[in-house]
Amino acid sequence: MLPGLRRLLQGPASACLLLTLLALPSVTPSCPMLCTCYSSPPTVSCQANNFSSVPLSLPPSTQRLFLQNNLIRSLRPGTFGPNLLTLWLFSNNLSTIHPGTFRHLQALEELDLGDNRHLRSLEPDTFQGLERLQSLHLYRCQLSSLPGNIFRGLVSLQYLYLQENSLLHLQDDLFADLANLSHLFLHGNRLRLLTEHVFRGLGSLDRLLLHGNRLQGVHRAAFHGLSRLTILYLFNNSLASLPGEALADLPALEFLRLNANPWACDCRARPLWAWFQRARVSSSDVTCATPPERQGRDLRALRDSDFQACPPPTPTRPGSRARGNSSSNHLYGVAEAGAPPADPSTLYRDLPAEDSRGRQGGDAPTEDDYWGGYGGEDQRGEQTCPGAACQAPADSRGPALSAGLRTPLLCLLPLALHHL
């Protein structure tokens, strides 16, 4: 052994050297070319690099992977490591997601596949195994339909973004496993009808956005079970009528938007008008389109005398629901020729005259309060690494020197200078 090295290993220097060796990090795969990597939490950002496929050399410890704004066309099984918590793939050219791609990502909490204009269909088991997934983004694709069991097993999901697709129909029980879902965004599609069990299972839903569709009918039981819903948007559709029974199933409703629909303020409007007389909600205008003598009036401001010429209402027991042999037009709030609308009065007789859902000791919340924490998809930008946990210099191309390694290196510096 060299004399200089023997002297270095004697005395206090040996402890300092041992501390240095213990602090050395284990060998890990390098950061993929053109990407930026951070060590805490393990993050790889490869956004906006014109990648046509996912990089092959991703560190297996990666927890957050940002691949947005590339040209990636397909995803295959085995591409992603099992430690992923966040995966952003929005604004690519995705057209195919092979079965099993996400099956082993059991820790994944957020998956963003939005703004992929070539993604026209999904396999039924695309999201199988994602039991911890909390946020799923499928907005602004070209999806025209969804398999009936596409969301099966997503028991932790809280946010589901399906807006601005080409969805024509939603199957009954499509969301049946999503007991924890609080936000469902379906606006900007081509939906024409809401069936009886389309939202069954969504007992925790707080916000439901259905504006900008082509809705012509809503089943009287479509919202049954949505006992926590506070925000409902149905504006900018093709609704001429809406069953009052449907809204009576929403005891927590606070904000309702029905504007920009061709409301028929004839006998068909009576159930909805009766609901407004008892409900305590913040609502948009409900402007009459027909008949001509009521055009431009607000449906909510009509009087009981406006419905005196209507046929006598049919008695309905509180809590009763129509069976399969009932008229489909009646169930969806569309009056048949010569058929009287159902009497809504018994549905509201037990509602309190005053709103008992206001906050104690303060003013009622405004709609802005409810949306204050929500940033639209267009506002997400191209954030490289969200959160303060992974701030690093812009030119960083690898993990920063750990604090545990700095101390022993500093203690070796004087020794090295002494033996030069």
Curated annotation (Swiss-Prot):
One of the GO BP terms on file: corpus callosum development
Propeptide span(s): 399-420
Keyword Signal: yes
Primary site of residence: membrane
Glycosylation sites: 50, 93, 236
Originating organism: Mus musculus
Family membership noted in the UniProt record: Belongs to the Nogo receptor family.
Record's compositionally biased regions (Basic and acidic residues): 294-306, 351-360
UniProt xrefs under Pfam families: LRR_1, LRR_8
Quaternary structure annotation from Swiss-Prot or TrEMBL: Interaction with MAG is controversial, and may be indirect. Interacts with MAG. Does not interact with OMG and RTN4.
The LRRCT domain, residue ranges: 261-312
Protein name: Reticulon-4 receptor-like 2
Start and end residues of each stretch annotated as Important for interaction with MAG: 315-327
Gene Ontology MF term list: signaling receptor activity
Membrane topology of this protein: Lipid-anchor; GPI-anchor
Domain LRRNT span(s) in chain numbering: 31-60
Summary of the tissues where the protein is detected: Detected in brain. Detected in hippocampus neurons (at protein level).
Chain positions covered by the region annotation Disordered: 286-399
GO cellular component: axon; cell surface; dendrite; membrane raft; neuron projection; perikaryon; plasma membrane; side of membrane
UniProt keyword list: Cell membrane, Cell projection, Disulfide bond, Glycoprotein, GPI-anchor, Leucine-rich repeat, Lipoprotein, Membrane, Receptor, Repeat, Signal
Record's comment on post-translational modification: Undergoes zinc metalloproteinase-mediated ectodomain shedding in neuroblastoma cells; is released both as a full-length ectodomain and an N-terminal fragment containing the leucine-rich repeat (LRR) region of the protein.
Gene field: Rtn4rl2
Lipid-conjugated positions (GPI-anchor amidated glycine): 398
Disruption phenotype: No visible phenotype. Mutant sensory neurons show no decrease of the inhibition of neurite outgrowth by MAG. Compared to wild-type littermates, cultured hippocampus neurons from mutant mice display an increased number of excitatory synapses. Likewise, mice lacking both Rtn4r and Rtn4rl2 display no visible phenotype. Sensory neurons from mice lacking both Rtn4r and Rtn4rl2 show moderately decreased inhibition of neurite outgrowth by MAG. Mice with a triple gene disruption that lack Rtn4r, Rtn4rl1 and Rtn4rl2 have no visible phenotype, are healthy and viable.
Localization terms from the record: Cell membrane; Membrane raft; Cell projection, Dendrite; Cell projection, Axon
